């Protein structure tokens, strides 16, 4: 039985990375440094732009985060692909929250737009995931749109984020 809370702490997210939150067969979040959120502040089975589920999570920004030291030297900026990966992470986390089992894999995205950046001077990144569809057959898959905001300003949008849960990834 999945503990379906509306919010999760950093320790909860780390427990997910160790395979402890959604059980031995549930999907896992990545461990640091690839875990791209500090907390989930809201999860619902309704709501969002399509009233089919919503997730909101946050990442605290500080100049010591690992990517600022290498991307780019003298011009530090969070790689846009990390924000995209965070959205995929949250789609997979939601599938586990719904009780889905398997190993999460990003399956694609229809369109991504970057209209801003995350600099070391920022305070907080907010991720918003609006679910469009959940497929619960042999393959469990989530389809969602996502947004990334920095200090309240929209900087990335993604349409048709897809994540699947697989029982066997050997042929993937």
Swiss-Prot record:
GO terms for cellular component: cytoplasm. The keyword S-adenosyl-L-methionine does not apply. The active site is at residue 71. Pathway: Lipid metabolism; fatty acid biosynthesis. Keywords: Cytoplasm, Fatty acid biosynthesis, Fatty acid metabolism, Isomerase, Lipid biosynthesis, Lipid metabolism, Lyase. It catalyses: a (3R)-hydroxyacyl-[ACP] = a (2E)-enoyl-[ACP] + H2O; (3R)-hydroxydecanoyl-[ACP] = (2E)-decenoyl-[ACP] + H2O; (2E)-decenoyl-[ACP] = (3Z)-decenoyl-[ACP]. It comes from the Bacteria. GO terms for biological process: unsaturated fatty acid biosynthetic process. GO terms for molecular function: (3R)-hydroxyacyl-[acyl-carrier-protein] dehydratase activity; trans-2-decenoyl-acyl-carrier-protein isomerase activity. Belongs to the thioester dehydratase family. FabA subfamily. Homodimer. Necessary for the introduction of cis unsaturation into fatty acids. Catalyzes the dehydration of (3R)-3-hydroxydecanoyl-ACP to E-(2)-decenoyl-ACP and then its isomerization to Z-(3)-decenoyl-ACP. Can catalyze the dehydratase reaction for beta-hydroxyacyl-ACPs with saturated chain lengths up to 16:0, being most active on intermediate chain length. This is 3-hydroxydecanoyl-[acyl-carrier-protein] dehydratase. The lineage of its organism: Bacteria, Pseudomonadati, Pseudomonadota, Gammaproteobacteria, Enterobacterales.
